[in-house]
Amino acid sequence: MIKINLLNHQSHSFPSKTTPLEIWKNWLKKTLKKPVAALFNQKFIELDYPLTQDGDLEILAESNPKSLFVLNHSTAHLMAQAIQRLYPNALFTIGPAIKEGFYYDIDFQNHSISEKDLPTIEKKMHEVALENHSMIMKKVTHDEAKRLFSYNPYKLILLEKHKEEDITVCHQGEFIDLCRGGHIPKLSLIKHFKLLKISGSYFQGDAKNKSLTRIYGTSFFKKEDLGNYLKLLEERKERDHKRLNKKLDLFMFSQEVGLGLPFWLPKGATLRRIVERYIVDKELSHQYHHVYTPIMANVELYRTSGHLEHYSQNMFPVMQLENKEKIVLRPMNCPHHMMIYKKSPRSYKELPLRIAELGMMHRFEKSGAVSGLQRVREMNLNDAHNFVRPDQIEEEIKKIINLILEVYRDFKITKYEFRLSYRDPQDKEKYFPDDNMWQHAENILKKTIQELNLPFREAIGDAAFYGPKLDVQVLTALGNEETLSTIQLDFLLPQKFDLTFIDANNKHCRPVVIHRAIVSTLERFLSHLIEENKGVFPLWLAPVQILLIPVSSSVNLKYTQEIKELLLSQGLRAEINSKEATLGYKIREAQELKIPYQIVVGDNEIAKNLITFRKYGQKNQTTTNIETFISSLNQEIMEKR
């Protein structure tokens, strides 16, 4: 007999090899409708999977959001079967379910596939689904699997990589795929799906391997849900910072200069400068010391820090100089800040010592990963390293968290969660091998966030190589999860750089370093602001706050220029649209540029020494004197509305 804990916390004993479907029929049929799969000990399984051990079981109905993962995984199999019929020579690699759908990486060999082919593949998928094949899992030996996939070199490589594991395959009609499982019972349940796009990829993410075709799709149980999701995708497209930038003209890239190297154009540079000043002023008010350090360093500095050993794949090649010195562009600011700390003997009275920098860094991102401002090769990180005594760790982390929340309030960031990232103890290559250090550091971070009563989730394998970290994961307007803020606890670098402070007993002691970034890189943060605000920035952030529009450039321009000079003298950012165009055209253009305020200047305003303004997104106009207008704007800026 096996003991199964159902989701309602009831425990029951069943004969070994009882299936989830049998349990549903006998115990849950009246309360749970339309089961499609199950979750056993946090692993997705089929309804006919024979249970042979104790564990936690959740039967998944169509209405359960978790079922979408199983549906999308099954739809990836359906797509592969349809493609095999259309392109018999296609070789399949991997086809997982992902957050909002699925993809499959395919080697089409001699065929070239484009998005024009997706409707044909979709049509074939519907045909195959109507055949209503069962999705049958079968355990096979390693040798049997090699015979089944002897024609596919990609599957053979995967089999060799997992030769110590149990091998299972999924049958659906004539199609067989290597798979761990988690499928719906029959293909006829797959009705409402859409193939979304095609991109390039490499087998196992290695650019040295052959280029593959990746087809993305999504699948839902209800037609209405698919329609709503496709509408959401259109909304996200409208918010994409790359698309919005075509009108806003904030930044650019140049193929002649290089991939992932952004240019900040005048309006974008203004926006960046506002954020930079805000961050620096905020950190200075929290007793940080801002510095500037070199963007490159002797390679030995990174050998000492451990970056050369653990992070070299993300670094640009070393430059050999004429005096045999080896220089590298820095991927991190940490070693430079260690040097500043080490410059002078430090007393325990000086700690915490908070060294901050808007530091330029260079990291080698693969060409396929570079994307707009979110993934670039040159970036500017809002970075700081807080050097503390061991007894100050918890209090300092709390202060950093409060600073993060303060900044989030000002930028109206509300969709986020804390993620506590640990090392994977089995990964001896990625992480520094000191079990006691890791256990101690992880316990401190967990204890601190628990004391603040902040909800968090845990993630194994996402720590930095030198220590655990507390990340703030922000949900973007495009539905992605991005790390915006991070707090990393480090006992290792002080040891590697032999950092010390003199305690009250005149003894040398080792400080602890807390790495922290409040708004990530400026590039990523600004892309987030563009998308979150859909290009409509609050007044305090807007690169151009007021656009002055003379009714007649020849008659009204002089008074318009006087107003502009007055606005500029008050610290406001104003421009004039003096184009020879109709008033309606100028107003529409101001709306497209998403400028917060437009002031129309005509004969009536000049005669009465007034202005007429309209706020972005509003139809009504207001006429007032310039002093009242400036006062209301200053109030709006002060309140960061």
From Swiss-Prot:
**What are its GO cellular component terms?**
cytoplasm
Q: What cofactors does this protein use?
A: Zn(2+)
Chain coiled-coil ranges: none
As to how many cofactors bind and how, the note says:
Binds 1 zinc ion per subunit.
Provide the binding site for Zn(2+).
C334, H385, H515
**Which Gene3D superfamilies does the record match to this protein?**
3.10.20.30, 3.30.54.20, Anticodon-binding domain, Bira Bifunctional Protein, Domain 2, Threonyl-trna Synthetase, Chain A, domain 2
Instruction: Please indicate which superkingdom the organism of origin belongs to.
Output: Bacteria
**InterPro entries per the record?**
aa-tRNA-synt_IIb, aa-tRNA-synth_II, aa-tRNA-synth_II/BPL/LPL, Anticodon-bd, Anticodon-bd_dom_sf, Beta-grasp_dom_sf, TGS, Thr-tRNA-ligase_IIa
- For this UniProt entry, which segments traverse the membrane? none
Chief subcellular location = cytoplasm
* Similarity comment: family membership: Belongs to the class-II aminoacyl-tRNA synthetase family.
Q: What the protein does?
A: Catalyzes the attachment of threonine to tRNA(Thr) in a two-step reaction: L-threonine is first activated by ATP to form Thr-AMP and then transferred to the acceptor end of tRNA(Thr). Also edits incorrectly charged L-seryl-tRNA(Thr).
This one is known as Threonine--tRNA ligase
Which organism is this entry from?
Answer: Phytoplasma australiense
Q: Which gene encodes it?
A: thrS
